A protein has these predicted regions:
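Amphipathic alpha-helical interface elements that mediate macromolecular binding in regulatory proteins
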Residues: 96, 134-139, 143-147
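Ankyrin repeat (ANK) tandem alpha-helical domains that serve as protein-protein interaction scaffolds
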Residues: 4, 163-185
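Long, highly charged low-complexity segments enriched in Glu/Asp and Lys/Arg with interspersed Ser/Thr
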Residues: 142-169
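Intrinsically disordered, low-complexity regulatory segments in eukaryotic proteins
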Residues: 121-131, 170-175
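A short, structure-level motif marking secondary-structure boundaries and short turns
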Residues: 114-116, 120-123, 165
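Long, compositionally biased non-globular segments that serve regulatory/targeting/scaffolding roles
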Residues: 2, 7, 11-103, 109-115, ...
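Residue-level signal for the start and early helices of compact helical domains
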Residues: 89, 136-137, 175
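Alpha-helical bundle/repeat cores within regulatory domains of eukaryotic proteins
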Residues: 120, 128-139, 159
Length: 185
């Protein structure tokens, strides 16, 4: 008797995905197909070829800079606190579905959409990414974070450099070797 074939796509195929993940992928595919110029931008940032902003800058902006400097984004008639938005979206989607970096199962991004499964590059592959990274870029686009990052890239980079410098100056835990004699009378 043959065994049932087990999916090797790490919960990214329609057999394994829950309805939330499935609808998320369909929405992402629709978004990126209808915004090809933004897909080109995502490709340049994800591959490190964008000379204005990087993944590290975007991540730093959302996770640390926004918290330290109370960054607000103005959208239509609303004022949104960036760090609070980021934390709320992260808690509702988890790192599995929302992450600036490629830490999970890879997917192929082509001109025709996102291809799940084996992420080996083919002729029509634009770049390799993850669903979580594509969701992060979609979130940044929808909230105007990319524009904010491009306008304030020098301040964000400076803050990141000064933070790294501060961390390097902090003394690390020191191990002190000495003899101790304990006498019990």
């Amino acid at each position: 008797m043959r065994q049932k074939k087990v999916c090797s796509l790490c919960c990214l195929c329609s057999l394994c995905m829950n309805s939330k993940e499935d609808s998320l992928i369909r929405n992402l595919q629709y978004f990126y197909q209808s915004h090809p110029s933004y897909l080109t931008f995502v490709q340049s940032v994800a591959s490190g070829k964008n000379h204005t902003i990087s993944l590290r800058i975007l991540d730093w902006l959302c996770t640390s800079y926004a918290k330290r400097h109370n960054v607000v984004i103005f959208q239509k008639d609303r004022v949104l606190h960036l760090h609070t938005m980021y934390k709320a979206f992260l808690s509702s989607h988890s790192k599995k579905l929302f992450d600036a970096f490629r830490r999970r199962q890879r997917v192929q991004v082509t001109k025709s959409g996102v291809i799940l499964g084996d992420a080996t590059e083919s002729e029509d592959t634009l770049f390799i990414s993850t669903i979580a990274q594509l969701m992060f870029f979609f979130w940044c686009y929808e909230r105007g974070i990319i524009e904010y990052a491009e306008e304030n890239v020098n301040a964000i980079e400076s803050d990141l450099r000064s933070y790294v410098k501060e961390k390097q100056k902090e003394p690390s835990a020191m191990v002190v070797h000495s003899k101790v004699v304990v006498d019990f009378d």
